[in-house]
């Protein structure tokens, strides 16, 4: 029994599932790269104030879910709970907004939230996100949504939907906020929810409790109170999405859990995951740059849960990624054979072929079991007689057929055999 266990609520990926995990992340990243987004590597922790100001102090993320601690210098730092605030801080700090706009970046990695662990909801979650900063253009909003849609489609996912709405702008939000507060004050809400309604009423709309959802059935909707500009922006986003062939469903009750969102807001939902149906989401944020000390530039982006996307693929029975660890499994029988096959394996790897070796002096039977487990297409077997003859046996592990190949030409022979 292990002396140590992984921290609660943190998934670990190892073969063969890790191959699927990597394939999901790379497929989503490739969709971003195809649209001209460059990679940015962000710190795992930041100044706590960055998230308090950027994400919003009244959000559950900041008030309940952040991993915050004082470092040895007495500074309050927080393990990153999301990526947009960090990307925005980096854009400002490094002057990226002084060049060509929009600044188009994507990121991936681990994020941290102290939540009650359950399927699809982890304390360390893997996410891939994109941010486009510097241009307020409905077509850019549509592009961002289309990038995620393309990534999901290339994975083979079909059971998801895109929910879309608008959260308005600085012109219409204040009057809507007042109407919503007036409505909420007339409801029999618990004390904590009442406080939230006074501090930030939109947060109440994000409440997932069934009893609260029932009370909110007749709440005023933001889409019914949009300014002329916000409504026109929203209509253009929908037009561009339709032009791109991206299907969506309007959900006027959609509210994201982060305060910086304005105008376009969206979520990717997969019903095969039960309660944790959201596999990604995002939106436009017009005031975040200025809030963090930068220029008054708008941005739009998303964060996609890699863990949840993998669960969605599994729920649909999709075989994602190459589960094989190698293409050819080298089986030496004896020390002299091992010395020669280790050299050949090195040559194969140099030629772009994934090659493994049965180390540890295994018997032929034991080594061939290892070959089967590796997922390799071929085994390259070398015994003492083969070595004397200057050839090895190349065995097709699917059909069982085998043939001798000259040791001096083994790399070329394996490469040829692997051709479609």
From Swiss-Prot:
Pfam entry (one): HGTP_anticodon
InterPro entries: aa-tRNA-synth_II, aa-tRNA-synth_II/BPL/LPL, Anticodon-bd, Anticodon-bd_dom_sf, His-tRNA-ligase, HisRS-like_core, HisRS/HisZ, HisRS_anticodon
CC terms in the record's Gene Ontology section: cytoplasm
A GO molecular function held by the record: histidine-tRNA ligase activity
Lineage: Bacteria, Bacillati, Actinomycetota, Actinomycetes, Pseudonocardiales
EC number(s) given by UniProt: 6.1.1.21
Subcellular location: Cytoplasm
Reaction equation(s) it catalyzes: tRNA(His) + L-histidine + ATP = L-histidyl-tRNA(His) + AMP + diphosphate + H(+)
This protein's record includes keyword Aminoacyl-tRNA synthetase: yes
Top EC class for this record: ligase
Transmembrane regions listed in the UniProt entry: none
Similarity comment text for this entry: Belongs to the class-II aminoacyl-tRNA synthetase family.
Subunit: Homodimer.
UniProt name for this protein: Histidine--tRNA ligase
GO terms (BP aspect): histidyl-tRNA aminoacylation
Keywords: Aminoacyl-tRNA synthetase, ATP-binding, Cytoplasm, Ligase, Nucleotide-binding, Protein biosynthesis
């Amino acid at each position: 029994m292990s002396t140590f266990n992984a921290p609660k609520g943190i998934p670990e990926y190892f073969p063969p599932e890790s191959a699927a995990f990597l394939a999901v992340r790379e497929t989503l990243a490739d969709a971003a790269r195809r649209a001209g987004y460059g990679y940015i590597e962000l710190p795992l922790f930041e100044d706590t104030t960055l998230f308090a100001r950027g994400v919003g102090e009244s959000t559950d993320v900041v008030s309940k879910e952040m991993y915050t601690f004082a470092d040895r210098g007495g500074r309050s730092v927080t393990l990153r709970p999301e990526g947009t605030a960090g990307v925005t801080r980096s854009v400002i700090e490094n002057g990226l907004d002084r060049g060509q706009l929009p600044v188009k970046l994507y990121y991936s990695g681990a994020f941290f939230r102290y939540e009650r662990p359950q399927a699809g909801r982890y304390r360390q979650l893997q996410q891939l996100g994109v941010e486009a900063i510097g241009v307020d253009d409905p077509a850019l909003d549509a592009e961002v949504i289309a990038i995620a849609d393309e990534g999901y489609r290339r994975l083979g996912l079909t059971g998801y939907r895109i929910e879309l709405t608008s959260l308005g702008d600085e012109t219409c939000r204040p009057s809507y906020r007042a109407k919503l507060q007036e409505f909420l004050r007339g409801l029999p809400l618990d004390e904590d929810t009442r406080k939230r309604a006074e501090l930030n009423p939109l947060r109440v709309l994000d409440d997932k409790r069934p009893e609260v959802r029932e009370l909110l059935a007749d709440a005023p909707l933001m889409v019914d109170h949009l300014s002329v500009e916000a409504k026109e922006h929203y209509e253009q986003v929908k037009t561009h999405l339709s032009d791109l062939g991206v299907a969506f469903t309007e959900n006027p009750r959609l509210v994201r859990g982060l305060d910086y969102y304005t105008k376009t807001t969206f979520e990717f939902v997969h019903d095969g995951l039960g309660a944790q149906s959201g596999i990604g989401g995002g939106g436009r944020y017009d005031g975040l740059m200025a809030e963090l000390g930068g220029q008054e530039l708008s941005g739009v982006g998303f964060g996609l849960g890699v863990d949840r996307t993998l669960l969605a693929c599994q729920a649909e029975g999709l075989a994602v990624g190459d589960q094989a660890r190698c293409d050819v499994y080298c089986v030496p029988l004896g020390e002299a054979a091992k010395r020669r096959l280790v050299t050949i394996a090195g040559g194969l790897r140099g030629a772009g072929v994934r090659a493994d070796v049965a180390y540890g002096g295994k018997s032929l039977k034991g080594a061939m079991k290892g070959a089967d487990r590796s997922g390799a297409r071929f085994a390259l077997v070398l015994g003492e007689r083969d070595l004397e003859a200057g050839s090895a046996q190349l065995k097709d592990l699917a059909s069982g057929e085998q043939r001798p190949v000259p040791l001096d030409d083994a790399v070329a022979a394996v490469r040829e055999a692997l051709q479609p």
